[in-house]
Amino acid sequence: MTTLTARPEAITFDPQQSALIVVDMQNAYATPGGYLDLAGFDVSTTRPVIANIQTAVTAARAAGMLIIWFQNGWDEQYVEAGGPGSPNFHKSNALKTMRKQPQLQGKLLAKGSWDYQLVDELVPQPGDIVLPKPRYSGFFNTPLDSILRSRGIRHLVFTGIATNVCVESTLRDGFFLEYFGVVLEDATHQAGPEFAQKAALFNIETFFGWVSDVETFCDALSPTSFARIA
């Protein structure tokens, strides 16, 4: 067992029965020329987030945590995105951007596209699990819940983009399914102004989970920390 210093209080978990979840670290969300950038969102400060996720993934893997990578998007025809009868059709900024700029049709969040791919710096390894997801929440229409329950995993540590959209949505759904969710705040990035990041983290630490950071997480997983706890 390890104890992680977090807000609003420390949380204790078994790394080997926990998962680190990397949410949507795709070119779409973290690279200039990707969907968020083309839709008018600022992605200029995502590079430190990528580096921090690399650090967190390395520490988590060494401690025996399961690593789960999400990729948000749909088939090339966007059938999975839903038609006019779906609220996703009306609220997805990727779909709205393509309707406004038809030349982008088939390029944003389409499986197999550059936009859909994970950023070059983040590469899943054997033993990791990579899951596509068609909506903001990683629990919707994916096998995430069964994957976690079959392994006895109850604690989820979240990283990725966007804090206020897919990260928060997945953590909230996990909360309703009795999972303990922790966000590493410096391994996440918001879609929108800085207040969106602050609001998401406030919601999480106040109502749905815990908030920590990468350095604290790595220190908690270090062999020295395990020795102190033992």
Swiss-Prot record:
GO terms for molecular function: hydrolase activity, acting on carbon-nitrogen (but not peptide) bonds, in linear amides. It catalyses: (Z)-3-ureidoacrylate + H2O + H(+) = (Z)-3-aminoacrylate + NH4(+) + CO2; (Z)-3-ureidoacrylate + H2O = (Z)-3-aminoacrylate + carbamate + H(+); (Z)-2-methylureidoacrylate + H2O + H(+) = (Z)-2-methylaminoacrylate + NH4(+) + CO2. GO terms for biological process: nitrogen utilization; uracil catabolic process. It is an enzyme of class 3 (hydrolase). Induction: Up-regulated by the nitrogen regulatory protein C (NtrC also called GlnG) and repressed by RutR. The keyword Metal-binding does not apply. It holds the Pfam family Isochorismatase. Its EC number is 3.5.1.110. The keyword Hydrolase applies. Keywords: Hydrolase. The active site is at D24, K133, C166. Hydrolyzes ureidoacrylate to form aminoacrylate and carbamate. The carbamate hydrolyzes spontaneously, thereby releasing one of the nitrogen atoms of the pyrimidine ring as ammonia and one of its carbon atoms as CO2. NCBIfam families: RutB. Belongs to the isochorismatase family. RutB subfamily. This is Ureidoacrylate amidohydrolase RutB. The gene is rutB.
